[in-house]
């Protein structure tokens, strides 16, 4: 797993009651882009250092925005 500042970390929900968790990567603590990452969780703005597990993926800001647009379209809402 490799990331850069501005990418997003998405931790996949494991059940229908537990939704995916999204965080913006605001700091990468290694020169090669590997974990740990300092992230800001979108749901509450909390910042923390994470070592992502196998249930997490890194996506670019563009990929994240496109996924949000698709999700909003499925839900019948306009993406912002």
UniProtKB/Swiss-Prot annotation:
Similarity comment: family membership: To M.leprae U650M.
Temperature dependence: Is rather robust, being able to refold back into its native structure after being heated to 80 degrees Celsius.
Pfam families: DUF1918
Oligomeric form and interacting partners: Monomer.
Protein's name in the database: Uncharacterized protein Rv2302
One GO cellular component term noted in the UniProt record for this chain: peptidoglycan-based cell wall
Superkingdom of source: Bacteria
InterPro entries noted in UniProt: DUF1918 (IPR015035)
Organism annotation: Mycobacterium tuberculosis (strain ATCC 25618 / H37Rv)
């Amino acid at each position: 797993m490799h990331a850069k500042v501005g990418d997003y970390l998405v931790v996949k929900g494991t059940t229908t009651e537990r939704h995916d968790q999204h965080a913006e990567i605001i700091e990468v603590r290694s020169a090669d882009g590997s974990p740990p990452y300092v992230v800001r969780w979108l749901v509450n703005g909390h910042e923390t250092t994470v070592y992502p597990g196998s249930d997490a993926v890194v996506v670019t800001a563009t990929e994240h925005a496109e996924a949000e647009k698709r999700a909003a379209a499925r839900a019948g809402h306009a993406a912002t």
